[in-house]
């Protein structure tokens, strides 16, 4: 009886051992795979990856030959076989029906359809065996163990950690998520050493102008996705260009991939792998970095439709790192699934036989909110007012969109097809779309031209008899009033300009005090207060109702006037994603006001110091954003700018929590050949560098010191100085962080913050960077360029010296 009972157990063990062996041993000559059967894939030893037949999404009778993530529910495809299309350079995905066979025989790997015709082979011979590696790489090897062919060497749209793309290779996006044909975008590692993203004119392989390039012609070497999760482009001199900066999540805790998506964005993704990661994160792919950051704004091609199809526009969601293509009102997609084909009007196009009056009756210009097609202009008028701009487009049968720029009184006309459409929140112009009037009936439209031609002369005759006697007087009165108002406003604005430096790089808009008083509702809603004034929320009386923040300088002393001029001069000559944009100013007598773009998520101070910790990923995003902004001020402006008052209150967050540096009232501008300056003490207690209290020159390193304090506050979600803490040693964050770092107890700084604990390696890195920034000796502090490299993980961080004094500025 015992042997009989033991037999089933032995069979189970044999089955288990056989499956385990299949996942670990070499794939030998004679092995084969077929769709729709248990034996349809070869699995890596870790079971993380599989190579074989995968059903095409939405088509259970068609199969790809592919490599995929085997432990993820949706079996994400990372490689798929392609074959040449009619002998041309472009390729198509290999798709076969059930009954097809993939066989490793006679020293070669061959895929044949049910009729026995070969549909794919990797074109290598003398193959001894194959392997599905734990890296996701499928290899064919000779009997001597040398690699004959590998999937890593013939990439599709995705690369994985440990994968390298040498010169002459490329990634091709898919046409759709479910259509594996070559799509509209390519990432090329060119033979000339340049790494380039191209828009492609499908179905051909013709490239339009690149929308991103590394600009390394003659110097580029290879694109690397290393084992730590960093993606960079190496140069022939050994240096590196970071392509993404997200190499921070443990390879043991997350699956990683980088894919050229169907929208043209090269994104790096992670997926929770370990039990601990799955307990903290949703089991789905999460984008942690992207190139370009906002493709809607990046692609501006002279030929081609742009990021989306013709007559459509592109929108970008920064919180989800996604793009979307939409049609403007009264337009619809040619194909709702294949939106890249663009949009068409849902109404009959305007007839060129209509006279002006009939066109005005049948069509109107309706404003659309911050949507623009920047390269579709075919006519321009200036100077002109908005009413005339509308009229000129309505009566022109070619015109579909008009853009009126109020500051310059310029009108631009655009005709179909419209290209490079995007949603632009910074757009200050009024965009007008021509559509049929809603009151039009079909009979009215068809007969409008003849009817108005017939009646027009009678209408003109009657109205001229009735109004003829008074029109001249009315015209003269209106002209006098308008001319007087114009002269008054012009005089005030000239006075404002005369009080400012001639080379100040002023913003384009000069406001009157009355305009800003009206925009803020009488300075009613307070957003915040500072040493030199109060900031109010307002709304411009433009077509878009643009929200603004108005800083009203309250102090009338000479120092306040100086700060006002410094701020106008400083921000007026800067433009960067991580700097708050100055839209305009008012300088009427004692009234000094600055008009900024409105930041909907307030200051970092409010965001960071509350009862709930913001997500770790958002804090990292803010830290990187602030560092980029400071790098721009210190090293990338025409004149070096030292902010001098970096603190959380002066870092604002927009709709997508992008950090923007603000409040340049204490800033110092240095000529190109000058690196330090002498000035009085500036800044805010707790963030001021020690050299402010010494008789030495001030350099950009004072901002680096302040950034070190802010970085620690971002890590720990607490202020630098907190008097009401249980442990006196924790009162001053910079002291406590140094002690924790020296003792190897960084975890104490983020106790109770599960996300930070999970990313403890990056927490340790950020703390080390902060301690370098907080060195008392300015020359010991890194530049912001070096800070960026350390935060990104691009360079090793040596152990920072123990600073002799963090808060000498508090004494």
Curated annotation (Swiss-Prot):
Q: Which residues cross the membrane?
A: 465-485
Instruction: Look up the EC number in the record and give it.
Output: 2.7.11.1
Keyword Disulfide bond attached: yes
Name where it's found: Membrane
Keyword set for this entry? Answer: ATP-binding, Disulfide bond, EGF-like domain, Glycoprotein, Kinase, Lectin, Membrane, Nucleotide-binding, Plant defense, Receptor, Serine/threonine-protein kinase, Signal, Transferase, Transmembrane, Transmembrane helix
Question: What one GO molecular function would you report for this record?
Answer: ATP binding
Q: Which InterPro entries match?
A: Bulb-type_lectin_dom, Bulb-type_lectin_dom_sf, G-type_lectin_kinases/EP1-like, Kinase-like_dom_sf, Prot_kinase_dom, Protein_kinase_ATP_BS, Ser/Thr_kinase_AS, SRK-like_kinase
Query: For side Extracellular, which residue ranges?
Result: 24-464
Residues that, per the record, bind ATP: 527-535, 551
Glycans attached where?
Answer: 26, 39, 59, 219, 226, 237, 242, 321
Q: Which residues form the Protein kinase domain?
A: 521-795
Its signal peptide is 1-23
GO CC field: membrane
Disulfide-bonded cysteine pairs: these are 296-314, 308-325, 327-343, 389-411, 393-399
Query: What does the record give as the active site?
Result: 645
The membrane topology of this protein is:
Single-pass type I membrane protein
Q: Which residues lie on this side of the membrane: Cytoplasmic?
A: 486-811
CDD domains per record: PAN_AP_plant
| Annotated EGF-like domain residues | 292-344
Residue span(s) of domain Bulb-type lectin: 24-153
- Function in brief: Involved in resistance against the herbivorous insect brown planthopper (N.lugens, BPH). Member of the BPH3 (BPH resistance locus 3) cluster which contains LECRK1, LECRK2 and LECRK3.
What family does the entry list?
A: Belongs to the protein kinase superfamily. Ser/Thr protein kinase family.
Name the chain's protein: G-type lectin S-receptor-like serine/threonine-protein kinase LECRK2
What is the protein's species of origin?
Oryza sativa subsp. indica
